[in-house]
Structure formats: C-alpha cells, structure tokens
C-alpha cells in the first residue's frame, strides 16, 4: 500500500504540472479551504482550477510533510503572479499583475493510492494584502 507521503507528493506534482488526470483525488474526494469547499473528484479539480486560471505560473512547494498511516500534514508556500481572473464567492477579481508568496498548511486523508480529503489553511488577509485588495 502506498505511503500517504507518496500520494501527497503525487498530488503536489500534478498541481504544479497542471495535470488533473495525474492528480490522485478519489471519486468521493473533498476539499475544504478558506472561502469554499468542493466534493467529488471533478468538483475538487474544478475548485483548484480557479487558482490555476488566476495564477498561470502557480507553484506549490512543500517545506515539511509528515504522515502517519493514511493521514498526512504539510506546510509550504504557493508562489504565483496574479495574471488571470480570480473567481471568488463574492465576485471576480481582475488580474492585478502582483506576485504572491503565500504560506499554507493542509491536513490530508488518503486511501491506498488516492487522496480522500484535504483541509487547506492559509491567511486570507495576507493573500488579499499581497494582491493589493485591502485598503490602506
């Protein structure tokens, strides 16, 4: 049985390569993140594609990855340039051209070689500030 770390590393590589076919999400996967959630493989991939559209050069880097059985936790950075439209629950944000470096953490549950769930955490205020969307 694959180690949870291997599944997470495959997921991160698929995100960085923009290869949704290689992303190991399970058919009944779930993602929960600031500002939204999605259930089911297709909806999860659609949820993540919002970030690819907004940040065409998006890259995820893991700084630390821990696992125990089917569970894993990671911390890392997201880098990218806001050169595309960012679709949010409150409306679309036009490209700002700003580069962001966003710290994130996630808790994962795997099942064999698939990713069942991700609970993603990041500082929304930091994110909005880097995009120049806060008064100030």
List where the protein language model places each region.
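C-terminal and inter-domain tail/linker signature
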Residues: 1-136
